[in-house]
Design a protein with these regions (language model features):
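Hydrophobic transmembrane alpha-helices and immediately adjacent juxtamembrane helices
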Residues: 48-338
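Short, aromatic-rich amphipathic segments at membrane interfaces
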Residues: 29-53
Length: 338
């Protein structure tokens, strides 16, 4: 153990403790000389070499996967063209889907806004009153938490609905002439109506706490688009597989429950050690949630996070190309298993 030592010389003040040492230069002389340091143990923490090796291997593997995905990108672009050519039909189906979702209830579409709002209030009460969560940096915990849970609501709702879209619209899947590849987009647009309402809610709540609309906050458009792309890419895989493996719907629900806490939404990732933080950041929704907080609270542009941005879009590219390939392979058998 190192006993705390505090001293002062003509040129500097110093303090050596068991956690390190502090040196303050006195005057304008930028040069100091330290001598006669003995019987001192200085603990220097550094990254283990295995960590650098693993990161290098992960980068090479991801680069190889992305390169392979790019080779099939040209064929996959035709898949997107189907949605563009049928945008009018998608808009009409999305409106009907949103209305029909709550058609049998007295309050109708109002439930689409009440359910997320009640959930927000419950989580807010648990974290602020129960766990007594403090402010995160300079941001009040309430606005920090809500700006993170709003995009998660959209992701969770959209992924659940798109994964089951071919089962729900089975009568359209059986029609030979209908382009069923537009159906996941229908569900995403349907979920977007509620999301836009809660984005306005963030603006209003932010103004209450002194976070007024500016150019940074307009980035929600970019991050919303990025989240739509992410859901669409994942849904190509899940909606195709779930027809053959119905248990996938339950598995997705479990993953989303874990994902809420692992993104994380209600607590800050700074509580974790460095290497664990990097593992958590591999979750693409971490990029989205952080992006919303950067837009409304931290005032950080998305291009100021270049590595996270490149990684996110690389994941989307790989998921999209794999999803299109899987969809095309399984599509001829859809009508047989519905």
């Amino acid at each position: 153990d190192i006993e705390e030592k505090v001293g002062e010389s003509e040129d500097l003040e110093y303090a050596i403790t068991d956690t390190g040492f502090d040196i303050n230069v006195i005057g304008s002389n930028p040069y100091i000389e330290i001598e006669n340091i003995s019987n001192q143990i200085i603990d220097v923490t550094s990254k283990p070499m295995i960590y650098d090796v693993l990161m290098m291997l992960c980068s090479l593997v991801l680069g190889f996967i992305v390169a392979n995905a790019l080779t099939g990108l040209k064929k996959s672009i035709k898949f997107i063209k189907a949605s563009i050519d049928n945008k009018g039909l998608i808009k009409s189906l999305a409106k009907n889907d949103f209305k029909n979702k709550y058609a049998s209830s007295y309050l109708g579409i109002v439930w689409g806004f009440i359910n997320p709002l009640i959930t927000i209030l419950v989580y807010w009460f648990v974290f602020t009153v129960g766990f007594r969560s403090s402010d995160v940096g300079d941001a009040p915990y309430t606005i920090w938490f809500i700006s993170g849970i709003i995009p998660w609501f959209f992701f969770s709702d959209a992924l659940n609905s798109t994964s089951n879209v071919f089962l729900e619209y089975s009568y359209l899947v059986k029609k030979v002439v209908f382009k069923i590849e537009i159906l996941p987009t229908v569900k995403i647009i349907s979920a977007l109506f509620v999301h836009l309402f809660f984005v306005i809610f963030i603006y209003v709540l932010g103004a209450v706490y002194g976070y007024y609309p500016d150019l940074y906050s307009l980035q929600f458009i970019y991050y919303s688009f990025a989240m739509i792309v992410l859901v669409f890419c994942i849904s190509l895989i899940t909606s195709s597989v779930i027809l053959f493996f119905r248990d996938l719907g339950q598995i997705i629900g479990i993953i989303l429950n874990i994902g809420f806490w692992a993104t994380p939404i209600g607590w800050t990732i700074d509580m974790l050690p460095g290497i664990v933080q990097r593992i958590f950041k591999l979750n693409p929704m971490y990029y989205i949630v952080t992006g919303y907080r950067d837009s409304f609270i931290n005032k950080v542009y998305f291009w100021e996070r270049p590595y996270e941005t490149i990684y996110f879009w690389a994941v989307c590219l790989v998921a999209f190309c794999f999803g299109v390939k899987l969809f095309k392979k399984l599509k001829p058998h859809f009508s047989d298993v519905i």
